[in-house]
């Protein structure tokens, strides 16, 4: 009886987990809370685009803000709403700067999507000029038919590299009275509009919508919105917490939040330092000593000289041969705790190429303190030179 | 250009990754096929349907000693289908790929695995081809009409099409990118890397789960405009106890082996913490450890342990100062296969310091050895000293003039020494090499004459015959990487050479031809 109840609870819990996971993985759901409140970027953008659709004019706007603030989600929601309101009056062309920053490629993609929207056959062989011409013709035709074309340019800053031919031809075509188009640029570079050339900038309406990371209050609301289940089931962020959800109890406990937090706040370099063998630590300490002696540059041979002198002075048991030390040195290179100082002399033997530390002496000292197997000599070697 | 690039490995893994038990592709001849590595077997296993018995979580954890927390993390983060991207990172040989593939096998029903080891796919084009061929239902051969996209935009479109087809049937697809760190050094890696890391945003398919495996830390992938971070799972290096557990795994005589490990593991662990290197060193050592024992099944008592320890102690000291070279998997298998051959190689490995010189038998002609030595001298000695060292009298005892060691000159000498250490072996023109070569061969001509062929044609016909021979051998030495030939100097126009051998090797070569090398080396 009790076992059956527990099994039922577990299945409910796993269902709940599935619901929550699905929700957290979906951008649209995460940011749909923004829809309800007035005076957000959502309502501003919607007003802007809707008015240019209904008044049949051209417009352009930039959405700027760091990643994860819901720029693309807002665009999606606005476009969804508009498609519902004016089903025949808009067509959307989406480009991504990461994929279509090349002008030829971008015009081809625009032509392809235009053909798809208007049930025209798309020719793969068309030249870039043909495609540009086709785009301008389509803009005119759509303008005459009172249809708005909305261009969504994600990663807008990447379109602003090079000659910016695409942006120019697009914005120039929008200068004519017949056309009817909206360009929405999305970028996480706040200076994206400064990247534009003069001829492009003058054709661009300087509307910008700034996205900032949500405040604590709105985050709290967002959390409630995300984690509250649809029906009032007995069950009460982020993805990781939900993944750590305890299936047996079916509760998102404080513990799961703590676990998730601790696994997200890692310091990769410190972790890497904890993984080193004693010999590798010796080499790092020797390098640190060399840096403290204000050597401008040093290589493996100089490190070995320092290592030998340390071993001679302290007579430790960790005295290993040249080749073994070199293998440890290579491990350090692999772990990217040290690296070559320059890219010159690629044909030179590795021993002689100058190297540098990629960690600070503070990090090294801390990791030695945390390391329980580390010999006391090492600690002393590191400390002494600091107070001298 | 339109020829699609499909590396052999990908076609094979695509054949094994398709869910139906596909027959081995008949195109690849079975004889030329290399032995499957454990990783590839694992890959095939991850793609194959799970066995009825061995698919419980406990069995999974038992196969991953010391990786319990990580395996649980992976399972939790991947498990019910929609999942955010995941990145596993940690040093080499910490079981990242193994844990991932085993976890995926555990999750097996209703999922599809697409695995791309970026190290074996040398270019974006090959990567695209591999991914798409693994996704397409019919493994596409090199002559198929499919065109491999080489632009990122075409690739993402093709990938989305292929994935849409699978996802619409309700399947979950796991895209695994192994060895992500190598992309950074690719030709267009700077553009490809953000593309790979943002694939989740670009595809917008929740049923497609992206997993990255990297030995570089996450901060290696930060870019200027950033990207939404994947969930990280960190794989730390194994601790001593975990390494012991791994090594003890399935050992025929656990008592004996654990007594061996208690002696040998700790000191070696101070040098390296990588399991693959440790096991490579420990295997021959254990064989050495067992030598006094007649019966390998014996359970050692205290007295026996002490005796064995004393026996192995000297070998342990040698092993500590030897390079841990990890043998190729295939050659390791060979050693295991042929018992006698394995013992032979182990003996050679532990022949000790004095044995090294006998091991070092390159089949090299005497004049090539002299050439090597003269190249070594030319690289190490400053050119200005040549006249003093290789005087016509052959002696170098006439270096009597000793400068006063004032403070300034001492300091200057120090900086020169420093510079020499930093610069490494110097380069030299061909003329200098030949001059030194002639000097040292003339000094030890008597030795050369003894060894020379009975006809003695070369020495009689004068230097011209010798020279042509020398040039030939010089190119041989360059090809075998004893010497390296640098670019020709723009002013002088002739190529410069540099010797790559270290002092130990040079001394050994000198000993083999009875040449007093140390007399000619400039000591600082």
Swiss-Prot record, chain B:
Indicate whether Nucleotide-binding appears among the record's keywords. yes
Entry's Gene Ontology BP terms: DNA replication initiation; response to sucrose
**A single Pfam family, by name?**
AAA_16
A single GO cellular-component term on record: nuclear origin of replication recognition complex
- Segments carrying the region annotation (Disordered) are 1-56
Q: Which InterPro entries match?
A: AAA_16, ORC5, ORC5_C, ORC5_lid, P-loop_NTPase
Locate the compositionally biased regions of type Low complexity: 1-19, 39-49
Disulfide bond entries: none
* Binding locations of ATP: 90-97
- UniProt-recorded Gene Ontology molecular function terms: ATP binding; DNA replication origin binding
Localization annotation: Nucleus
Instruction: Output compositional bias ranges, type Pro residues.
Output: 20-31
Which keywords appear in this protein's UniProt record, sorted alphabetically? Answer: ATP-binding, DNA replication, Nucleotide-binding, Nucleus
Q: Specify the inducers.
A: Reduced expression upon sucrose depletion-mediated cell proliferation arrest, and accumulates after sucrose treatment.
The cross-references to SUPFAM superfamilies, in alphabetical order and at most eight, read: P-loop containing nucleoside triphosphate hydrolases (SSF52540)
Tissues of expression: Expressed at low levels in the shoot apical meristem (SAM), leaves, ears and roots.
- Family as reported in the entry's similarity comment: Belongs to the ORC5 family.
Q: What does this protein do?
A: Component of the origin recognition complex (ORC) that binds origins of replication. DNA-binding is ATP-dependent. The specific DNA sequences that define origins of replication have not been identified yet. ORC is required to assemble the pre-replication complex necessary to initiate DNA replication.
Q: How does it assemble?
A: Component of the origin recognition complex (ORC) composed of at least ORC1, ORC2, ORC3, ORC4, ORC5 and ORC6. ORC is regulated in a cell-cycle and development dependent manner. It is sequentially assembled at the exit from anaphase of mitosis and disassembled as cells enter S phase.
The protein in question is named Origin of replication complex subunit 1
Please report the organism this UniProt entry assigns to the protein.
Answer: Oryza sativa subsp. japonica
Provide the gene name from the record: ORC5
């Amino acid at each position: 009886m009790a076992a059956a109840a527990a099994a039922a609870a577990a299945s409910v819990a796993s269902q709940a987990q599935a619901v929550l996971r699905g929700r957290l993985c979906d951008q649209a759901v995460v940011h749909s809370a923004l829809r309800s409140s007035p005076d957000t970027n959502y309502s501003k953008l919607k007003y802007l685009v809707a008015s240019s659709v209904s008044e049949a004019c051209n417009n352009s706007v930039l959405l700027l803000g760091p990643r994860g603030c819901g720029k693309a989600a807002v665009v999606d929601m606005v476009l969804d709403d508009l498609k519902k309101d004016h089903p025949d009056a808009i067509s959307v062309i989406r480009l991504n700067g990461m994929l279509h920053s090349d002008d030829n490629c971008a015009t081809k993609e625009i032509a392809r999507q235009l053909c798809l929207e208007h049930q025209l056959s798309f020719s793969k062989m068309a030249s870039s000029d043909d495609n540009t011409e086709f785009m301008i013709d389509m803009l005119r035709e759509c303008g005459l038919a009172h249809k708005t074309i909305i261009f969504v340019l994600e990663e807008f800053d990447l379109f602003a590299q090079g000659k910016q031919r695409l942006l120019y031809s697009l914005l120039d075509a929008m200068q004519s009275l017949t056309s009817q188009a909206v360009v929405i640029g999305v970028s996480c570079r706040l200076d994206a509009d400064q990247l534009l050339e003069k001829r492009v900038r003058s054709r661009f309406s300087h509307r910008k919508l700034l996205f900032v990371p949500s405040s604590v209050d709105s985050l709290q609301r967002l959390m409630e919105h995300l984690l509250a289940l649809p029906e009032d089931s007995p069950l009460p962020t982020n993805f990781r917490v939900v993944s750590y959800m305890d299936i047996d109890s079916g509760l998102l406990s404080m513990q799961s939040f703590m676990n998730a937090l601790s696994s997200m706040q890692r310091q990769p370099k410190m972790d890497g330092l904890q993984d080193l063998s004693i010999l590798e630590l010796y080499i790092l300490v020797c390098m640190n000593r060399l840096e403290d002696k204000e050597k401008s540059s040093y290589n493996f041979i100089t490190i070995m000289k320092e290592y030998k002198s340390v071993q001679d002075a302290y007579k430790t048991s960790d005295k290993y041969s040249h080749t073994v030390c070199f293998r440890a040195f290579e491990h350090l290179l692999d772990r990217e705790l040290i690296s070559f100082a320059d890219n010159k002399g690629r044909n030179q033997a590795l021993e002689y190429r100058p190297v540098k530390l990629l960690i600070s002496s503070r990090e090294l000292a801390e990791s030695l303190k945390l390391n329980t197997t580390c010999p006391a000599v090492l600690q002393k070697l590191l400390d002494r030179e600091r107070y001298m | 250009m339109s020829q699609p690039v499909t590396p052999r490995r990908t076609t094979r893994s695509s054949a094994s990754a398709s869910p139906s038990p596909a027959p081995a592709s008949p195109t690849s001849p079975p004889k030329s096929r290399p032995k499957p590595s454990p990783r590839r077997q694992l890959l095939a296993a991850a793609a194959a349907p799970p066995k009825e018995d061995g698919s419980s979580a406990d069995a999974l954890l038992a196969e991953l000693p010391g990786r319990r927390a990580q395996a649980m993390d992976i399972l939790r983060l991947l498990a019910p289908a929609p999942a955010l991207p995941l990145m596993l990172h940690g040093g080499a040989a910490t079981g990242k790929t193994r844990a991932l593939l085993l976890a995926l096998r555990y999750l097996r029903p209703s999922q599809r695995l697409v695995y791309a080891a970026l190290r074996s796919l040398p270019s974006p084009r090959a990567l695209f081809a591999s991914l798409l061929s693994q996704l397409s239902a019919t493994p596409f051969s090199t002559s198929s009409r499919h065109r491999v996209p080489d632009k990122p935009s075409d690739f993402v479109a093709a990938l989305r099409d292929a994935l849409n087809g699978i996802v619409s049937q309700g399947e979950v697809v796991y895209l695994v990118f192994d060895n992500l760190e190598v992309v950074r050094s690719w030709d267009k890696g700077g553009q490809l890397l953000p593309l790979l890391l943002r694939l989740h945003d670009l595809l917008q398919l929740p049923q497609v789960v992206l997993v990255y495996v990297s030995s570089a830390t996450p901060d290696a992938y930060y870019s200027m405009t950033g990207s939404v971070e994947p969930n990280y799972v960190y794989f730390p290096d194994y601790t001593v106890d975990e390494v012991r557990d791994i090594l003890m795994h399935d050992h025929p005589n656990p008592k004996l082996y654990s007594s061996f490990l208690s002696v040998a593991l700790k000191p070696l662990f101070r040098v390296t913490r990588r399991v693959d290197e440790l096991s490579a060193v420990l295997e021959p050592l254990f064989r050495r450890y067992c030598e006094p024992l007649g019966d390998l099944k014996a359970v050692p008592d205290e007295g026996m342990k002490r005796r064995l320890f004393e026996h192995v102690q000297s070998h342990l000291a040698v092993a500590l100062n030897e390079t841990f070279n990890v043998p190729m998997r295939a050659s390791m298998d060979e050693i295991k296969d042929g018992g006698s051959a394995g013992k032979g190689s182990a003996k050679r490995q532990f022949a000790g310091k004095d044995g090294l010189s006998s091991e070092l038998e390159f089949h090299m002609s005497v004049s090539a050895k002299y050439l090597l030595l003269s190249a070594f001298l030319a690289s190490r000695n400053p050119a200005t000293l040549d006249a003093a060292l290789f005087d016509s009298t052959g002696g170098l005892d006439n270096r009597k003039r000793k400068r006063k060691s004032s403070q300034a000159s001492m300091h200057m000498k120090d900086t020169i020494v420093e510079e020499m250490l930093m610069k490494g072996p110097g380069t030299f023109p061909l003329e200098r090499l030949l001059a030194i070569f002639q000097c040292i061969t003339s000094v030890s001509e008597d030795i050369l004459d003894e060894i020379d062929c009975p006809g003695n044609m070369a020495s009689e016909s004068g230097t011209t015959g010798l020279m042509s021979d020398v040039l030939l051998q010089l190119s041989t030495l360059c090809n075998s990487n004893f010497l390296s030939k640098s670019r020709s100097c723009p002013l002088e126009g002739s190529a410069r050479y540099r010797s790559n051998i270290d002092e130990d090797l040079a001394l050994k070569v000198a000993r083999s031809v009875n040449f007093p090398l140390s007399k000619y080396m400039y000591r600082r």
